[in-house]
UniProtKB/Swiss-Prot annotation:
The keyword Transmembrane helix applies. InterPro entries: MAS20 (IPR002056), Tom20_dom_sf (IPR023392). The chain crosses the membrane at residues 9-28. Central component of the TOM (translocase of outer membrane) receptor complex responsible for the recognition and translocation of cytosolically synthesized mitochondrial preproteins. Together with TOM22 functions as the transit peptide receptor at the surface of the mitochondrion outer membrane and facilitates the movement of preproteins into the TOM40 translocation pore. Present with 5680 molecules/cell in log phase SD medium. GO terms for molecular function: mitochondrion targeting sequence binding. The lineage of its organism: Eukaryota, Fungi, Dikarya, Ascomycota, Saccharomycotina. This is Mitochondrial import receptor subunit TOM20. Residues 1-8 are mitochondrial intermembrane. Keywords: Membrane, Mitochondrion, Mitochondrion outer membrane, Phosphoprotein, Protein transport, Transmembrane, Transmembrane helix, Transport. Belongs to the Tom20 family. Residues 29-183 are cytoplasmic. GO terms for cellular component: mitochondrial outer membrane; mitochondrial outer membrane translocase complex; mitochondrion.
């Protein structure tokens, strides 16, 4: 037992020195932060650089995701094109919705599920209604992939819907601008 006493004493002294050093550094850092303009400037620059790096990382991640979705959608549509025959559209719709629902339940199959839902959307007569249903019923990650796919390659029925929304927005902006001029 007499041998453990010096070990414990050494451990206690080492712990006390480490705690005192950490406290001293914290006090020094706080003093520099409060009183040194150069130190504050360096801290602000580091914070700006960190924010810029994070923004670049987010942008790069979005670009990679967009590229991945573009390649996948192109490959998927080349492998299984959307039918143009009206009689096949209903069967295509039900098949793709069923496959999309089945795939959405599996982890890691979000992109495949989104492509099935996208194909169903392309043959559906009222895409706005179906998008609303998708938004309420499928997981958010899959819905985001569907929106990306629509942005990459808008189907004909969705393109007319999007153009209608953009056109009405442009018309309302023109009316608002005309009202501002008259004042």
């Amino acid at each position: 037992m007499s041998q453990s006493n010096p070990i414990l004493r050494g451990l206690a002294i080492t712990t006390a020195i480490a705690a005192l050093s950490a406290t001293g550094y914290a006090i020094y850092f706080d003093y520099q932060r409060r009183n040194s303009p150069q130190f504050r400037k360096v801290l602000r620059q580091r914070a700006k650089e960190q924010a810029k790096m994070e923004e670049q990382a987010k942008t790069h991640a979005k670009e990679v995701k967009l590229q991945k979705v573009t390649e996948f959608l192109s490959m998927e549509l080349a492998k299984d094109p959307i039918p143009s025959d009206p009689s096949e559209r209903e069967a295509t719709f039900t098949t793709n919705v069923e496959n999309g629902e089945r795939l959405s339940m599996q982890q890691g199959k979000e992109l495949e599920a989104a492509s099935k839902f996208y194909k169903a959307l392309t043959v559906y007569p009222q895409p706005a209604d179906l998008l609303g249903i998708y938004q309420r019923s499928i997981p958010e990650a899959i819905y985001e992939y569907i929106i990306l796919m629509i942005a990459i390659l808008p189907p004909a029925n969705v393109a007319s819907f999007v153009k209608g929304v953009v056109g009405s927005k442009a018309e309302s902006d023109a009316v608002a601008e005309a009202n501002d001029i008259d004042d």
